[in-house]
Amino acid sequence: MSKDTLEAIRFDKENVTLDILDQLLLPYESRYINIKSIQDAFEAIKSMQVRGAPAIAIVGAFAITVDTHLYLKSGETSKTVADLLNSIDYLVTSRPTAVNLANACNEIKALLVSHFEKSDLVTEKVWKLLFDYSVSLHEDDLRNNFKIGENGLRFISETLKAQNFKGPFSIVTVCNTGSLATSGHGTALGVIRTVHAQLSKSVSNEEFWFEHVYPLETRPYNQGAKLTTYELHYEKIPFTMICDNMVTSLISTLHKKKNIKGSAAPVKFIITGADRVVKNGDSANKIGTYQLAAIADFFNSTFTKEEDKIKFMVAAPNTTIDLKTETGDEIVIEERPAHELTSLKGPVLREDGSVGEKMTVGIATPGIQVWNPAFDVAPYQLIDCIVTEDEPFKKVDGKFSF
């Protein structure tokens, strides 16, 4: 793996071109695809060639910029600001649950409306406004991800000290929340990166240290298996992948100090990302997140020692927080096609270890009824901390306040 394969988004400022890493081909093939239009971005986001709430917002903003640049180069003069606004509205419908894309598009629309009339023609001035916004969005996201990592580390260290915990600990995470889902470093996986760098046994000055992470396979799209393991392997962070339905067994086994693949470090933190965090703290994330929060809550109700208890953390930038939506009940949950659950797609692995052509293999009875929501909502009551670039938010009197 080369380092640049962890760069999900490549935007050339001088030539105004956008390329994205096709995440449907990972981990066996690293190929970039060129995005030339809003329609290209819509299809890439919808098909999940690019995914992760921060990443799709950045790709969306850059795509609007590139689309406008190519339109101006074509010499056409018919497109109005109103036409552009309509195209932006269309782009938002590619992934309705992820608030980052909607937020970025709404901010772009607000900028356009504040600077131009809807009847104005799209000009270089319009393009420059789009260019500046998208570049700033990308740079801000990267900077904020490192802050999220530091704030997550702070919460983890303070928690372990308060619990008087000593020895090694492990972390569970779901889906992919790293460099491939953001501008770089990541949110939940960014916290894990920071913890690995500063709290591993070889560098920790504390009586506790990070030892292992357990990424979930993340059915049905397998982002954990394909993408998170790809990043962890590259970063040389100790990990063992498990299926989504192994978490309770994992926590129970490690709590009994039984060794799993060379580690017996108990699970102390479950860290997830979010596609939307609403005003009360309810957090929409990859399907299976709610069950992780419920599992942590169950074990905490059975553990008698404070030092055994597990903290459930959500790591997300401020751009993911939706203060206009009061509770998680109001979040629109995207439903994915049935075939994503009833079949698997991937390259053929030959006996000699080489990679062959991609194939789709059925794994379920044909023609059955399927429910395939892409997200669920973890209620705020089960969340211990929501880590943003500003601070690790904890509940006061049982409630979050952002």
UniProtKB/Swiss-Prot annotation:
Entry's localization field: Cytoplasm; Nucleus
Gene3D superfamilies: translation initiation factor eif-2b, domain 1, Translation initiation factor eif-2b, domain 2
One term under GO cellular component: nucleus
Reactions this protein catalyses: 5-(methylsulfanyl)-alpha-D-ribose 1-phosphate = 5-(methylsulfanyl)-D-ribulose 1-phosphate
EC numbers, comma separated: 5.3.1.23
Annotated active site: D275 (proton donor)
A GO biological process held by the record: L-methionine salvage from methylthioadenosine
Recorded metabolic or biological pathway in which this protein acts: Amino-acid biosynthesis; L-methionine biosynthesis via salvage pathway; L-methionine from S-methyl-5-thio-alpha-D-ribose 1-phosphate: step 1/6
Signal peptide from the UniProt entry: none
Keywords associated with the record: Amino-acid biosynthesis, Cytoplasm, Isomerase, Methionine biosynthesis, Nucleus
Predominant subcellular localization, coarse grouping: cytoplasm
Pfam families, sorted: IF-2B
Role of this protein: Catalyzes the interconversion of methylthioribose-1-phosphate (MTR-1-P) into methylthioribulose-1-phosphate (MTRu-1-P).
Family note: Belongs to the eIF-2B alpha/beta/delta subunits family. MtnA subfamily.
UniProt protein name: Methylthioribose-1-phosphate isomerase
Name of the gene encoding the protein in the UniProt record: MRI1
